[in-house]
Regions:
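Internal, conserved structured core segments that host functional sites
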Residues: 132-216
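Short beta-strand segments
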Residues: 46-47, 80, 145-149
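Short catalytic helix/loop segments, enriched in acidic residues and glycine
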Residues: 59-76
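Glycine-rich anion/phosphate-binding loops
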Residues: 117-136
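Short, surface-exposed acidic-centric catalytic microdomains
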Residues: 80-108
Length: 358
């Protein structure tokens, strides 16, 4: 078991990192442009989820999966907006309150107020969030896990108070700035990660985003983009045929775009495509497509076994890991270069066993 070090943030102007690594793991872009191993992805996280006692009541919300399982493969960048903005621990509880116009909307912002005192933290929190997110951009995050229901960090359905009524219509002030400034970044709440499909999708997006950023922050060329896209074809197809087709057209017409427009558009559509959760039906279609490359190489009995496993997954009888393991076995056995290089076969560390549950 790798050694984990836990560093408590003391200066909000310096990104503080908890480093958690596992030997011999790397997300690799195996082409002529990026052949080095990538470091464990850096993930922003609400500090209380790591077990730090920074909650308003002096407690924490340690998440076992994030700390003990996922944490072995990533580098955490912990943030507690409420502590870092100067509220202290323990502290008065805060909540979101609708503006005088009524239910919040884009034109009707909410305020962040102390529950008892009514102290208004809105301006300070918004300014802090803008500054802190600028800092976070410099550490090249690959994802972010936010604390659900938090008036600062909640991503969706945060309680908003208005004239004695409460609606689940808000978003934390820090979370709002984060997703506005980093629109392609994989962001999720810890509560939703209890759903196996959402968990697998988030982790998949984290590692894909890291590979994507490694490409476009380097000295990329249209040729390297074509190679990158080719390796991700099946993975993209498993999420959305429409997104897959749109990216294919973009890559085919690279000469029509400036480098900046090509980079911005490809990254936006790539991440939007992966954000659509893959279904058993989509996975089954992709694996059937892959079998087309194998049909002349494997024996009838092996083909029937693989087809049966794919159909069982489509019907919800077996998890994705069953047909994927069989498919990966035949791809490696016959050394099929195109399929062997597909990120779809192993989009995240196998040790996480995420495909055992979807």
């Amino acid at each position: 078991m790798p050694c984990v070090s836990h560093v408590t943030p003391v200066d909000r102007h310096s990104p503080i990192v908890i480093r958690q690594r596992i030997d011999n793991h790397a997300a690799t872009i195996n082409n002529n442009v990026v052949s080095r191993d990538l470091a464990p992805p850096r993930i922003g996280i609400s500090r209380c989820l790591l077990g730090d006692e920074v909650r308003y009541d002096g407690g924490h919300k340690r998440d076992a999966f994030l700390v003990s399982t996922f944490g072995r493969f990533v580098e955490w960048v912990p943030v507690c907006p409420e502590v870092e903005v100067g509220m202290g621990t323990p502290r008065e509880a805060i909540h979101l309150v609708a503006s005088a116009e009524g239910v919040p909307s884009n034109a009707q912002p909410v305020r962040l107020l102390g529950v008892r005192s009514g102290e208004d933290w809105t301006t300070r929190m918004t300014a802090f969030a803008s500054s802190r997110v600028r800092e976070l951009k410099s550490v090249d995050l690959a994802g972010y896990v936010l604390k659900k229901d938090s008036p600062s960090c909640g991503l969706e359905r945060v309680r908003v108070h208005s004239d004695g009524h409460v609606t689940r219509s808000g978003r934390g002030l820090f979370a709002e700035v984060l997703i506005t400034e980093l629109p392609n970044l994989p962001v999720e709440e810890e509560g939703r990660l209890n759903d196996p499909s959402l968990r697998e999708n988030f982790v998949e997006r984290v590692f894909a985003y890291q590979r994507l950023r490694a490409l476009f922050t380097g000295r990329w060329t249209t040729h390297s983009l074509v190679i990158f896209h080719s390796r991700h074809k099946l993975q993209l197809l498993s999420h959305s045929r429409q997104g897959y087709a749109e990216l294919g057209r973009l890559v085919a017409d690279v000469v029509k775009y400036s480098r900046r427009d090509l980079s911005v558009t490809y990254q936006r559509v790539f991440m939007a495509t992966l954000a659509r959760v893959a279904t058993p039906g989509r996975h089954s279609d992709v694996m059937m497509h892959a079998i087309g490359h194998l049909k002349r190489l494997i024996q009838a009995g092996d083909r029937d076994e693989l087809l049966g496993a794919i159909e069982d997954h489509r019907r919800g009888i077996v998890p994705l890991v069953v047909p994927i393991t069989l498919l990966r076995h035949h791809v490696r056995r016959h050394d099929l270069g195109y399929l062997k290089d597909q990120t779809y076969l192993e989009p995240h560390p196998r040790e996480l066993a995420l495909r055992n549950h979807v």
